[in-house]
Amino acid sequence: MKIFISQPMKGRDAEEIQKEREEAILALKNKYGEGVEIIDSFVKDLPKDANAVWLLSKSIELLSYADGALFLRNWYEARGCRIERWICHEYGIEMVKL
């Protein structure tokens, strides 16, 4: 199973984001076993001119490969996460719960 992780990132540092992701990945592996594949949606090297729409387009592209999506804490506060959730709902991508 390929899982996309949707996570609020605005105003957070990379270390905090990575720590939360690692905890989620561990929980997913405990639930689904080692066969779970995590789609890495954390963009580390942003182009200079990248804006929010560009980032969202990359997230949607990655989400298109997913069998399921996990929405992390406070997802509803982030516009991008809300859009990703709407896409899951509209296109039948399973919303994974831990």
Located regions from the model:
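Conserved catalytic or regulatory cores that recognize and/or transform ribose-phosphate-containing ligands
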Residues: M1-L98
